[in-house]
Regions:
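Conserved glycine(s) of the Walker
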Residues: 180-181
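Conserved small/polar residues in nucleotide/adenosyl-binding loops
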Residues: 404-413
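Short, small/polar residue-rich loop motifs at catalytic or cofactor-binding pockets
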Residues: 353-357
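Hydrophobic positions on the alpha1 helix immediately C-terminal to the Walker A/P-loop
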Residues: 185
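Flexible phosphate-sensing "switch/lid" loops adjacent to ATP/NTP-binding sites
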Residues: 1-172, 189-341, 346-348, 363-365, ...
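Short beta-strand scaffold segments in enzyme catalytic cores
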Residues: 358-362
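A short acidic/small-residue loop/turn micro-motif
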Residues: 375-378, 416
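A short, polar/charged loop-to-alpha-helix boundary motif
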Residues: 377-392
């Protein structure tokens, strides 16, 4: 695999930049941590060389300064929201995250339940955690959030929320998924800290979009493809352009909410420490791209992959035509075509020749292996057997599994399905 990203440089530069931001705010920083902390496979696909657990490893370099607060929405607990990638509910994922962080030597200080309005399921989860010896805090559902800043930043708004007791300079606010209330938790804490005379700060850590590469760079387009279901749109940060005359990239939700966040900062701190959404971020990933063409090509491949994933979801009834249309547009913007992914023409050609569904897989060394549907095997099963034979150096004419065994397995599967 060609490398386009310097992971060691990233770990060093990112941790140093976060330390600088901690010092900027008098040794107390609330860091909203977006995305996946230790299984970021999207980043590893579009930035070849980026390790899926890079962000976790970066935090481990700050382990003596950091504590983690895991946030979960009471609404998500109540509806048993499930992580699509893991198939587990958000409340179960809180326990999984705690275990993983602790195993890696990171300190988890507490869990915070947000958007609470008396849900019995949230009460039960709180009791469950407390029986395990875990500190739990509650943030209440605030009427008029986020636009009624005068009420929100008052004793009747943030003031009613629990104050999360923390002991370390860096407080990492993370969650099982989006919409959990990470930013609200950070701002609520700032309100309480300033009431106590502590001039704490806030920053946001998101890997994508990368702020200091072009708007239509394939890496940023691949982020839009990954969030097609959310309809996130990358855009030029108008506040940054107006303040500094410098073009940077952010995404629509952060740009749209910035005036509200700015007003909250002014009410809490007296003035907003940031002039733009880009200013709030601490992401150094763009500075660690060492081969731009490698990252561009990897991102084009990712957009194609997302297209097929979107098509699969559409057929399964879990996706929409709008998501597929958006990814088709992103393919054009990235100057990519479906045939650019080697497995696509390989599987389509075999399907045409065999008159039945076919599949293809590209190995790390570039070899493309195919498999077709037969009386005994589906395309995927045939493909896996052919890949095993290829890797083991077995002639493809040799039957790795006898006809008799395959037929017996098929009969068993049908009989007890």
């Amino acid at each position: 695999m060609k490398i386009g990203f310097d992971n060691d440089k990233y770990l060093k530069m990112q941790s140093e930049h976060i330390r600088e931001r901690i010092n900027q705010f008098g040794n107390k920083l609330y860091l909203e941590f977006g995305g996946k902390l230790f299984d970021d496979y999207h980043a590893s696909r579009v930035l070849p060389g980026f390790e899926p657990d890079s962000k976790l490893r970066m935090l481990m370099q700050l382990s003596d300064q950091a504590e983690i607060v895991i946030v979960i929405s009471a609404a998500d607990i109540d509806k048993n929201k499930v992580r699509g990638d893991l198939g587990i509910t958000y409340d179960e994922d809180v326990l999984r995250l705690m275990e993983v962080f602790t195993e890696r030597g990171l300190y988890v200080g507490s869990v915070c339940i947000t958007q609470y309005s008396g849900q019995e399921s949230a009460d039960a989860f709180k009791k469950r955690l407390e029986k395990l010896g875990i500190k739990v805090y509650v943030l209440y559902l605030i009427p008029g959030y986020p636009n009624n800043t005068s009420f929100i930043v008052s004793d009747e708004g943030y003031g009613k929320n629990d104050y999360i007791e923390t002991t370390r300079p860096l407080v990492v606010i993370t969650a099982p998924g989006p919409g959990s209330g990470k930013m609200a938790t950070c701002l609520s804490q700032l309100y309480h800290e300033y009431k106590r005379g502590v001039k704490a700060g806030y920053a946001k850590f998101e890997t994508f979009p990368i702020w200091n590469i072009p708007l239509k760079h394939p890496v940023n387009l691949a982020y839009e493809a990954a969030t097609a279901d959310l309809n996130d749109v990358n855009m030029i940060d108008p506040f940054h352009l107006d303040a500094y005359g410098v073009t940077t990239v952010n995404y629509n939700r952060d740009v749209e909410i910035f005036p509200v966040v700015q007003a909250m900062f002014e009410k809490i701190m007296g003035e907003c420490p940031y002039k733009s959404p880009t200013d709030m971020g601490v992401n150094m990933a763009g500075n660690c791209i060492i081969d731009d063409e490698v990252c561009q090509e990897a991102s084009r491949q990712e957009i194609i992959r997302r297209y097929y994933k979107g098509m699969d979801a559409l057929i399964a009834g879990t996706g929409t035509e709008e998501e597929v249309y958006k990814i088709e547009l992103l393919l054009k913007q990235a100057h990519a075509a479906l045939k650019d992914r080697k497995v696509v023409p390989a599987s389509l050609e075999l399907e045409k020749a065999a008159g039945a569904p076919a599949a293809a897989m590209e190995l790390d060394d570039g070899r493309v292996i195919t498999g077709k549907t037969s009386d005994l095997l589906g395309a995927s099963s045939a493909l896996l057997l052919n890949v095993l034979k290829e890797l083991a150096g077995i002639d493809h004419a040799v039957h790795a599994v006898s006809y008799t065994h395959l037929r017996a397995h098929e009969t068993l599967a049908i009989s007890y399905a």
